[in-house]
Amino acid sequence: MNTVNASMTVIGAGSYGTALAITLARNGHSVVLWGHNPAQIQTLQHDRCNQAFLPDVPFPDTLLLEADLARALAASRDVLVVVPSHVFGDVLRQLKPHLRPDARIVWATKGLEAETGRLLQNVAREALGETIPLAVLSGPTFAKELAAGLPTAIALAATDAQFADDLQQGCMHCGKSFRVYSNPDFIGVQLGGAVKNVIAIGAGMSDGIGFGANARTALITRGLAEMSRLGSALGADPSTFMGMAGLGDLVLTCTDNQSRNRRFGIMLGQGKGVQEAQDSIGQVVEGYRNTKEVLALAQRQGVEMPITEQIYQVLYCHKDAREAALSLLGRARKDEKPSV
């Protein structure tokens, strides 16, 4: 690919990165898609679709494939990073030497930093410096529906108001099929995407056990309370968690089997082991690592998160899923409102 002036460079050619690239390109924006595996990029270029994840969605003509990172980053000042959270920092450090002087970074990665549990904004600042504008996309988005052009809405938060406006009114203005809501709460929009992964595993476990819709709904509601408590402790606006990046994403991933986290939880509830369930999914289950990271973050903040604690016990301490659920049901009585 010769150097071009693109509206956006997308880093990460998995299902979600490809779906976002298709969505932007379909709506008239020039988009460059880069992936870490040159052979994969060559295959995508040959097939003009992502056979592995989105085989029924052809690439628009304005979606360009690039295997050379330097050329991909030279094509646009705006860079959308869509990679798993446990490699987020490594990828940003890989990008830094090749970024344009006027570069701006937005990510659609959901989660916290592996091992440390830090918000991704802190990882980005450490990797890229204090001056580069940053933004985050988060909300209820399944890759297959997004790529198919089905109506989707998402939240956008940025460190720079002009950057947020440029994205919302510019390359992320995609007609009626993809609606972007701006939100000034940079912390809350990031956090919602991490905590919902954990609660989705719990919802799947509940359904795998066979506890039914009542239990699932109670778990979602109390999971939202945990999300809000942790967010408030970190300085987020609690109202953010009633929006796309909170309740919206939480309901989606807890109730639909397109969610890898939910399917993973269902298998655990049915008695499968953690490794067996992960192998069956065949893709990254973000909630597995997120559970450890979210719990550690909550403990540092002194925030009680009993659902997250029990999911951690199942994932890392070999506790039976049914026993974990019964532990939650057996907790001391509490008033609902003060704990929210």
Curated annotation (Swiss-Prot):
It is found in: Cytoplasm. GO terms for molecular function: glycerol-3-phosphate dehydrogenase [NAD(P)+] activity; NAD binding. NADPH binds at residues 15-16, 36, 110, 143, 260, 284, 286. Its main location: cytoplasm. InterPro entries: 6-PGluconate_DH-like_C_sf (IPR008927), 6PGD_dom2 (IPR013328), G3P_DH_NAD-dep (IPR006168), G3P_DH_NAD-dep_C (IPR006109), G3P_DH_NAD-dep_N (IPR011128), NAD(P)-bd_dom_sf (IPR036291). It holds the Pfam family NAD_Gly3P_dh_N. GO terms for biological process: carbohydrate metabolic process; glycerol-3-phosphate biosynthetic process; glycerol-3-phosphate catabolic process; glycerophospholipid biosynthetic process. Transmembrane segments: none annotated. It is an enzyme of class 1 (oxidoreductase). It catalyses: sn-glycerol 3-phosphate + NAD(+) = dihydroxyacetone phosphate + NADH + H(+); sn-glycerol 3-phosphate + NADP(+) = dihydroxyacetone phosphate + NADPH + H(+). GO terms for cellular component: cytosol. Sn-glycerol 3-phosphate binds at residues 110, 139, 141, 196, 249, 259-261. Catalyzes the reduction of the glycolytic intermediate dihydroxyacetone phosphate (DHAP) to sn-glycerol 3-phosphate (G3P), the key precursor for phospholipid synthesis. HAMAP family: NAD_Glyc3P_dehydrog. Belongs to the NAD-dependent glycerol-3-phosphate dehydrogenase family. PANTHER family: GLYCEROL-3-PHOSPHATE DEHYDROGENASE, GLYCEROL-3-PHOSPHATE DEHYDROGENASE [NAD(+)] 2, CHLOROPLASTIC. This is Glycerol-3-phosphate dehydrogenase [NAD(P)+].
